[in-house]
C-alpha cells in the first residue's frame, strides 16, 4: 500500500489533535476531490514497518487523541489488508485510549453488502474503528460549516465492535 502523506498534528480530520494517514488508491473519483492525486494507488510512498512505527510513536504522545485514516480511500480494495493491520495494531496497543476514525467514499449500506458477500477483512476493519465517515464527496452539496465532513450527504457513524451506536 502507498500513502500520500502523514500529518502528525491535525485538528480537521476528526475530534481532537490527531495523526492522519492519507492513503493512496480510490475508485470514486469525486468531482472536486480535495486530494485527487491520491486516486492513483501508486502515488506517494510505500507504507513500511518504519511508517507504522512513526504512527505508533505519534500516538504515544499525550496530546494525540488518535488516528485518522483518509485518502484516497482507506477501503480501496487493494488497501484493506494493510489498513486491517494498521487498525488491529493500534487497537491492540491502545485499546479505547486512542480513537480510530476512517473516511471512505463507500456508504454504510455498500460496506454491509460487501461484508455479506464475504469480505472478512472489511468486517475486521469496521470492528476495530470507532468512527466511520461515509459517502462520496458531492461538490454540489459542499458545506463549509460542516464538522468533519465535506458535503452534507456524508454521515458520521460511531461504532462499537463494527455496529452503529445511536
Annotate each PLM feature.
Residues 2-29:
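N-terminal pre-triad scaffold of radical SAM enzymes
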Residues 6, 72, 135-136:
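Fold-independent oxyanion-binding glycine-rich loops
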Residues 1-3, 17, 35-120:
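Conserved Radical SAM active-site core
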Residues 12, 109, 165:
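Flexible, glycine-rich phosphate/dinucleotide-binding loops
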Residues 26, 74, 137:
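Hydrophobic pocket-lining residues within nucleotide cofactor-binding pockets
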Amino acid at each position: 500500500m502507498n500513502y500520500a502523506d502523514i500529518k502528525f498534528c491535525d485538528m480537521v480530520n476528526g475530534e481532537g489533535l490527531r495523526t492522519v494517514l492519507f492513503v493512496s488508491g480510490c475508485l470514486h473519483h469525486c468531482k472536486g476531490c480535495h486530494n485527487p492525486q491520491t486516486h492513483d494507488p501508486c502515488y506517494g510512498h510505500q507504507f513500511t514497518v518504519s511508517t507504522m512505527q512513526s504512527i505508533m510513536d505519534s500516538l504515544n504522545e499525550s496530546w494525540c487523541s488518535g488516528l485518522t485514516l483518509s485518502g484516497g480511500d482507506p477501503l480501496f480494495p487493494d488497501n484493506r489488508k494493510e489498513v486491517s493491520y494498521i487498525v488491529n495494531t493500534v487497537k491492540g496497543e491502545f485499546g479505547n485510549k486512542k480513537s480510530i476514525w476512517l473516511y471512505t467514499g463507500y456508504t454504510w449500506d455498500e460496506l454491509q453488502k460487501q461484508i455479506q458477500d464475504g469480505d472478512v477483512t472489511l468486517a475486521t476493519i469496521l470492528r476495530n474503528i470507532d468512527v466511520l465517515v461515509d459517502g462520496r464527496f458531492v461538490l454540489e452539496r459542499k458545506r463549509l460549516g460542516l464538522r468533519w465532513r465535506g458535503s452534507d450527504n456524508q454521515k458520521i457513524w460511531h461504532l462499537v465492535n463494527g455496529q452503529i451506536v445511536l
